[in-house]
Amino acid sequence: MPVFALLALVAYSVSLALIVPGLLQKNGGWRRMAIISAVIALVCHAIALEARILPDGDSGQNLSLLNVGSLVSLMICTVMTIVASRNRGWLLLPIVYAFALINLALATFMPNEYITHLEATPGMLVHIGLSLFSYATLIIAALYALQLAWIDYQLKNKKLAFNQEMPPLMSIERKMFHITQIGVVLLTLTLCTGLFYMHNLFSMENIDKAVLSIVAWFVYIVLLWGHYHEGWRGRRVVWFNVAGAVILTLAYFGSRIVQQLIS
């Protein structure tokens, strides 16, 4: 029985239940309890995932689609929990915790295998590590873009009043672009290590991943150029950011999903 996975699922659920009162009330007690529950969930999630990705013995690493998705969600949740502990980014927590809960549940109760042996190819280990960090970073940037769009829409339609709990739009936009820049640097390193260490990068098996990753990189470069040189703001930067995240998701997971559906 995956005890730590079940504990993580319960802790994520408790944290989600506590986030709503934490958003509606200024009492910090709800928020502290939500953060404590989230930390418990993250620790249990990490232990459960370690057991799934690194099984006993020299049997390699199980980098199945669900395991990788759960690992990415763990990385995103860890970053957003740290941000929330500083009383920022609370509007995004229900999304990231629900995403992590669903990913972990699927990885636990619908297990599958995709065994690799990264210990024999350290270059590939670096490449995969960079790809995970770049993807998680750019997904967080996309979440900030969605938060920016939502608050902007609510204010323009007079559905949301200004209050001390709501972050300024300019502050969210600055953070979004700062995170996007970090993600683009990591994505650039990912593409470079792929060229060096993946000898079959442009084979039939990997051509879709390579092309879509390059397209996503180009979208982000255009976004940053448009913002810093042409002054792009508002909906345009949101659409570019979300489009880049969608294309990158298709690059990282699209072919694996199709392969598993076929098999």
Curated annotation (Swiss-Prot):
Example GO molecular function: heme binding
Q: Which cysteines are joined by disulfide bonds?
A: none
InterPro entries from the UniProt entry: Cyt_c_assembly, YpjD/HemX
Q: Which residues lie on this side of the membrane: Cytoplasmic?
A: 24-34, 84-89, 147-181, 229-236
Residues passing through the membrane, by range: 4-23, 35-54, 64-83, 90-109, 124-146, 182-201, 211-228, 237-259
Q: Which UniProt keywords apply?
A: Cell inner membrane, Cell membrane, Membrane, Transmembrane, Transmembrane helix
Species for this entry? Escherichia coli (strain K12)
Q: What is the lineage of its organism?
A: Bacteria, Pseudomonadati, Pseudomonadota, Gammaproteobacteria, Enterobacterales
Ranges of the Periplasmic topological domain: 1-3, 55-63, 110-123, 202-210, 260-263
Which gene is annotated as encoding this protein in its UniProt record? Answer: ypjD
Principal location: membrane
Highest taxon of the lineage:
Bacteria
GO CC annotation, single: plasma membrane
Does the keyword field hold Cell membrane?
yes
Quote the Pfam families the UniProt record gives. Cytochrom_C_asm
Topologically, how does it sit relative to the membrane? Multi-pass membrane protein
Name of this protein: Inner membrane protein YpjD
Q: What subcellular compartments does it reside in?
A: Cell inner membrane
Q: Name one GO biological process term.
A: cytochrome complex assembly
